[in-house]
Amino acid sequence: MAKEIAKSLLDIEAVTLSPNDLYTWSSGIKSPIYCDNRVTLGYPLVRGAIRDGLINLIKEHFPEVEVISGTATAGIPHAAFIAEKLKLPMNYVRSSNKSHGKQNQIEGAKSEGKKVVVIEDLISTGGSSVTAVEALKQAGAEVLGVVAIFTYGLKKADDTFSNIQLPFYTLSDYNELIEVAENEGKISSEDIQTLVEWRDNLA
């Protein structure tokens, strides 16, 4: 599954690699990889495979789940697909409270006293996941864990989740992606070294 998802992300250019002309993330980090999983929404077969893969992770690791929660904004559609298939209540979590109306940070299903799984599109440092998890816990939820489409495999993310003692699982990761990209002839052996060094240095 990990390699199939990685291949799909590369094929539809949800993930692009540019070892010799670095991207600039919103955080200012220079990176040879750019991931925009919102692209998957335009490909029914890919988004369906992602939905089913995430459902399998949930059934394997969090079978007692009662509410599906998406992180705003990219996690929301995948959470909706999953909740619909599993016939479960769903909500989503903003990065901060609204400035108007009821000023809610969580919209949708009530979380209090419920076992919740958080849906992310991408895990980089884990920061957005922690924001969502903390908001849900403050609302009285029992957060079981996080599932996501892809992770860069940064040590910082491992540390982030370890610090809040919460498990996370992903459909694919950086190592699988690099291997698939090499097998597909999209990158050279020199590119691989650049990609690995970037990840290790950032970690």
UniProtKB/Swiss-Prot annotation:
It catalyses: orotidine 5'-phosphate + diphosphate = orotate + 5-phospho-alpha-D-ribose 1-diphosphate. CDD domains: PRTases_typeI. 5-phospho-alpha-D-ribose 1-diphosphate binds at residues 94, 98, 100, 120-128. Orotate binds at residue 124. Pathway: Pyrimidine metabolism; UMP biosynthesis via de novo pathway; UMP from orotate: step 1/2. GO terms for biological process: 'de novo' UMP biosynthetic process; pyrimidine nucleobase biosynthetic process. Signal peptide: none annotated. Its cofactor is Mg(2+). Homodimer. Belongs to the purine/pyrimidine phosphoribosyltransferase family. PyrE subfamily. HAMAP family: PyrE. This is Orotate phosphoribosyltransferase. The gene is pyrE.
